[in-house]
């Protein structure tokens, strides 16, 4: 049990996919200007990342490995992710049209979010079992969501702040992301 808790804490804080592994930077910078959009994207990404991680594990264990089709791993994982994203988009469109409009192009772009594919591939490389794969996917999603929501809240405050002209927009966003990354480096000794 403690092994699973350590894996979760490690994935959320210590080895955060955005700030440590630099995966998922496109939605991190693109959707983080408004807190409402960031929360919606976080929920959608959490669902997609967790489900895609579990399904990728199952595809790998029960299709690719038994038939010695390891060379199709990346392509099959992308297909799994695309199916999960399409399912998520249909659910979001039916349940919340406003959220669907707010997320815009970023919802279908979860398919190409390298963090989602990265989690699936790292699950295989690190030889996680089913429960570890689910926890790793969920932890990566929670870490992504945490960073995205914190960053979007900071960007909203920065939009109202008196920032010098050369630093407005993307420049101050990159500086803020760098400072967040430094803050998350403080968690490095938390899990060994």
From Swiss-Prot:
Q: Which domain of life is it from?
A: Bacteria
Q: Which UniProt keywords apply?
A: Cell inner membrane, Cell membrane, Electron transport, Membrane, Translocase, Transmembrane, Transmembrane helix, Transport
* The EC number(s) this enzyme carries: 7.-.-.-
Subcellular compartments: Cell inner membrane
Q: Does the keyword Cell membrane apply?
A: yes
Q: Which residues cross the membrane?
A: 5-25, 39-59, 65-85, 102-122, 134-154, 171-191
Q: Which Pfam families match?
A: Rnf-Nqr (PF02508)
Membrane topology per the record?
Multi-pass membrane protein
Its GO CC terms are: plasma membrane
Q: Which GO terms describe its biological process?
A: electron transport chain
Function comment: Part of a membrane-bound complex that couples electron transfer with translocation of ions across the membrane.
User: Known PANTHER family for this protein?
Assistant: INTEGRAL MEMBRANE PROTEIN OF SOXR-REDUCING COMPLEX, ION-TRANSLOCATING OXIDOREDUCTASE COMPLEX SUBUNIT A
Looking up NCBIfam families in the UniProt record yields: PRK05151.1, rnfA
UniProt lists the family membership as follows: Belongs to the NqrDE/RnfAE family.
Q: How does it assemble?
A: The complex is composed of six subunits: RnfA, RnfB, RnfC, RnfD, RnfE and RnfG.
Q: What is this protein called?
A: Ion-translocating oxidoreductase complex subunit A
Source organism phylogeny:
Bacteria, Pseudomonadati, Pseudomonadota, Gammaproteobacteria, Alteromonadales
Q: Which gene encodes it?
A: rnfA
């Amino acid at each position: 049990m403690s092994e699973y808790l350590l894996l979760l804490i490690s994935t959320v804080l210590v080895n955060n996919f955005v700030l440590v592994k630099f995966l998922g930077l496109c939605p991190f910078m693109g959707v983080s200007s408004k807190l409402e959009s960031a929360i919606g994207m976080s929920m959608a990404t959490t669902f997609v990342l967790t489900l895609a991680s579990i399904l990728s594990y199952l595809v790998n264990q029960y299709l690719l490995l038994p038939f010695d089709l390891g060379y199709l791993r990346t392509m099959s994982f992308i297909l799994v992710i695309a199916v999960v994203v399409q399912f998520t988009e249909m659910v979001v469109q039916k349940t919340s049209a406003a959220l669907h409009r707010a997320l815009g192009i970023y919802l279908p772009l979860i398919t190409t979010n390298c963090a989602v594919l990265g989690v699936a591939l790292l699950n295989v490389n690190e030889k996680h079992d089913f429960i570890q794969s689910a926890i790793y996917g969920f932890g990566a999603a929670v870490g992504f969501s945490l960073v995205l929501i914190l960053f979007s809240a900071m960007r909203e405050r920065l939009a109202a702040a008196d920032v010098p002209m050369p630093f407005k927009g993307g420049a101050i966003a990159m500086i803020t992301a760098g400072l967040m990354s430094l803050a998350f480096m403080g968690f490095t000794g938390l899990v060994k």
